[in-house]
């Protein structure tokens, strides 16, 4: 996976600890470690070659003893999935599901890089995970998502039909406000609304225009800001897999509509436009 160059550089630094959250990210975590170990072995070979005639037992031992600092820094103490919970009950669950492994991170010294399988709403991160990681007092926290930014409803799987449920969408809306381009949202709304009575085969997904002015990094930075819990001062970064990286990692699974907005059926375009119209009318027309 092409996830994070800075995280990969951490394989050469003794002050970076890698972990995963939640339990469903375990497979992605081991895949990440495999990639890091391959990269580290390549670096070891190059460092040994550079020694040339100056090789000594001590230098060779130092190079060969380099390891990825992999720790199970967080774990679920009860078998619960907060993803499918509703409203306040979800927040209550998220706040109590996880515990940490003390001593796995050197306070104020180590960077903590944790991989998540996906960050959709951001509830678990904000209400639980970041607070728990902050109790370890790392120098910085980097949350790496093995999936790209989930920007659109699925409609073929889990029922999340409201655009405002997605942290990526909320971040894009906030960026419109910050940059003084909120009027774009009304244009998108008018385009979506004009298509409501068209046959689904003629509908274009104009919701994709919500993200057009911003890079993925812009949205990730805004998400990190929005998901920072009150009272947490540790530096926080969120890094997402790219869509290109996803296709490279999973070449035989081309479906990416919840990331790209390219729905496999016309009905998807129609439904996502309806979802944006509902969001806009509830958020702006009622003011």
Name what the model sees in each region:
Residues 1-287:
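PRPP-associated nucleotide enzymes
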């Amino acid at each position: 996976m092409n996830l994070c160059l800075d995280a990969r550089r951490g394989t050469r630094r003794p002050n970076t600890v890698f972990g995963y959250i939640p339990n469903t990210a375990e497979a992605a975590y081991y895949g990440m470690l495999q990639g890091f170990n391959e990269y580290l072995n390549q670096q070891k070979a190059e460092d040994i070659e550079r020694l040339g005639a100056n090789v000594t037992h001590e230098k060779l031992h130092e190079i060969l003893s380099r390891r990825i600092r992999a720790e199970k820094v967080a774990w679920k103490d009860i078998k619960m999935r907060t993803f499918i919970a509703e409203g306040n009950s979800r927040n209550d669950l998220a706040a109590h599901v996880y515990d940490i492994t003390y001593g796995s991170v050197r306070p104020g010294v180590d960077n903590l890089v944790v991989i998540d399988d996906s960050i959709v709403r951001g509830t678990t991160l904000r209400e639980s995970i970041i607070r728990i990681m902050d109790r370890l007092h790392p120098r910085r926290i980097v949350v790496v998502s093995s999936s790209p930014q989930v920007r659109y409803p699925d409609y073929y799987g889990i029922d999340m039909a409201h655009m405002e449920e997605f942290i990526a969408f909320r971040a894009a809306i906030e960026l419109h406000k910050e940059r003084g381009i909120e009027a774009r949202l009304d244009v998108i709304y008018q385009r979506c609304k004009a298509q409501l009575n068209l046959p689904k085969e003629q509908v274009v997904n104009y919701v994709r225009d919500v993200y057009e002015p911003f890079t993925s990094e812009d949205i990730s930075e805004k998400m990190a800001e929005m998901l920072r819990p009150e009272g947490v001062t540790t530096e926080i970064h969120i890094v997402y897999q790219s869509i290109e990286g996803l296709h490279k990692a999973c070449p035989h699974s081309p479906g990416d509509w919840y990331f790209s907005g390219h729905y496999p059926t016309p009905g998807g375009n129609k439904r996502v436009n309806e979802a944006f119209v509902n969001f806009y009318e509830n958020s702006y027309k009622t003011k």
